[in-house]
Amino acid sequence: MLDKIWYRSKPNLLSRVLQPISLVFIDIANKRKIKQQLKQYKSKIPIIVVGNISVGGTGKTPVVRMLVQQYLAQDKKPAIISRGYGAKADNYPFEVTSGTLATQCGDEPAMLFDALQAQVPIVIAPERVQAVKYIEKNFPDTDIIMSDDGLQHYKLARDKEIVVVDAIRMFGNKLCLPAGPLREPIERLKEVDQIIVIGNCSDKDKELLKNYKNVTYAKVVATEFVNILTAKKVAKTEFNHQNAIAIAGIGNPTKFFKTLEESAINITAKKVFKDHHKFTQSDFEGIDSDITVVMTYKDAIKCKNFAKANWWYLDIALDINV
């Protein structure tokens, strides 16, 4: 329901009714921001925050993955911090290791650890300053820290801010919560160092983005399919015109389904779960065991313990137009 209210080019009647509450939200958020900035923690290690000003999935984690891979290729020593949304660790800060479950650290940290093959420290804490201090103490040779999300976590000083924008949803009706999808007013974009727009946006939206500096466009590119059970990798063309059921428990499943369709897969059914869904075997009851199941990397991490031989995830990369 909220999607129908928020993601319109212009606010509808209900959004207008909710606008007074949005003004209260903005006032509270501004006071919180000022209070946090007065006691900001400044690390000696440069910190880059990759976040957004809207709710929902915009593609932050793939951007973090891409940037960390670039730093590794330059022989740098990056580390990653995250809130660890939905995590149930015994203590914080919590370092992700090879034995860590997604339920302990959260979906995105688990996926990043797997994708980066344990090459970088990943530390989670609801208070990101704790995670930074843990890295400073335990990984003193770290020369850059990437924060997956946390743009509005002003307790932590940052050296660079990158905002990720979904080209399809953009900023919706451009109103703040609850009248619209924004966590902060759209004017906040004038303060950030870089904006990365993922997907193809309209000419009208490109005109809007001309008001902001350092806008980069990127698109999601399907790279390969990976078997969840065996980790076998195959070219995406292997699934051309093959029937498959698509599973998605992410913030914006439409993007995933579109990527599958662009890979010439014949999707016979789509099963959508809420973002950060804790998958169990019962979620797949009624699915023909002979048909191929395809899901996102983030979802696959949580299905490893009960995956079948014909379950795959689609790995992706970002094609950046610099």
Swiss-Prot record:
Q: Which GO terms describe its molecular function?
A: ATP binding; tetraacyldisaccharide 4'-kinase activity
Top-rank EC class of the record's enzyme: transferase
| Chemical reaction(s) catalysed | a lipid A disaccharide + ATP = a lipid IVA + ADP + H(+)
Domain of life, source organism: Bacteria
Give a GO biological-process term.
lipopolysaccharide core region biosynthetic process
| EC code(s) of this entry | 2.7.1.130
Give the GO cellular component terms, alphabetically: plasma membrane
Q: Where does ATP bind?
A: 54-61
Family (UniProt): Belongs to the LpxK family.
Q: Which HAMAP family match?
A: LpxK
State the PANTHER family in the record: TETRAACYLDISACCHARIDE 4'-KINASE (PTHR42724), TETRAACYLDISACCHARIDE 4'-KINASE, MITOCHONDRIAL-RELATED (PTHR42724:SF1)
Instruction: Return the NCBIfam families for the record.
Output: lpxK (TIGR00682)
Q: What is this protein called?
A: Tetraacyldisaccharide 4'-kinase
Lineage at the top is:
Bacteria, Pseudomonadati, Pseudomonadota, Gammaproteobacteria, Thiotrichales
